[in-house]
């Protein structure tokens, strides 16, 4: 059974480093806003194995500065588990949390293909 959990930033960093910044020092996986009070970090797990992670930060969108916005960053899925929908699952869990627990109006991101 799959489970989405809200976690500390230390929990998401190993997978974030492995997938997004493997050729950089581990510290490169620490994003500047990781410990902000409004930062939220999620894992998707099966049993005790983390399959996917995502982090959300309270950050306005330049094109809509008057809207309450969160930014998605540091999203990663275990390489052997990619293309199976796990990224979508953790993202939907994060969006459900925002809808229930915040007054956010916009969720935005900058995307890259790795």
Regions found by a protein language model. Give the residues of each.
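Short alpha-helical
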Residues: 11, 113-114
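A conserved beta-turn-beta hairpin within the catalytic core of GNAT-like acetyltransferases
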Residues: 59-72, 82, 101-105
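A short beta-loop-alpha structural element at the N-terminal edge
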Residues: 1-13
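Active-site rim helix/loop that mediates acceptor-substrate recognition in acyltransferases
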Residues: 16-47, 51
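Conserved beta-strand in the GNAT
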Residues: 43, 49-60, 71-76
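Conserved acetyl-CoA-binding loop-helix of GNAT-fold acetyltransferases
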Residues: 77, 83-96
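Short amphipathic alpha-helical segments
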Residues: 10-17, 88
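Conserved GNAT acetyl-CoA-binding A-motif
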Residues: 91, 98-112
């Amino acid at each position: 059974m799959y489970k989405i959990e809200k976690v500390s930033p230390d929990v998401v960093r190993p997978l974030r480093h492995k997938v997004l910044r493997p050729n950089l020092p581990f510290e490169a996986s620490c994003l500047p806003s990781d410990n902000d009070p409004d930062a939220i970090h999620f894992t998707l797990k099966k049993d005790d194995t983390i399959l996917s992670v995502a982090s959300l930060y309270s950050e306005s969108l330049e094109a809509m500065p008057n809207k309450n916005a969160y930014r998605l960053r540091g999203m990663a899925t275990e390489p052997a588990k990619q293309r199976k929908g796990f990224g979508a699952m953790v993202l939907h869990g994060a969006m459900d949390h925002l809808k229930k627990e915040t007054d956010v109006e916009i969720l935005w991101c900058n995307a890259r293909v790795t």
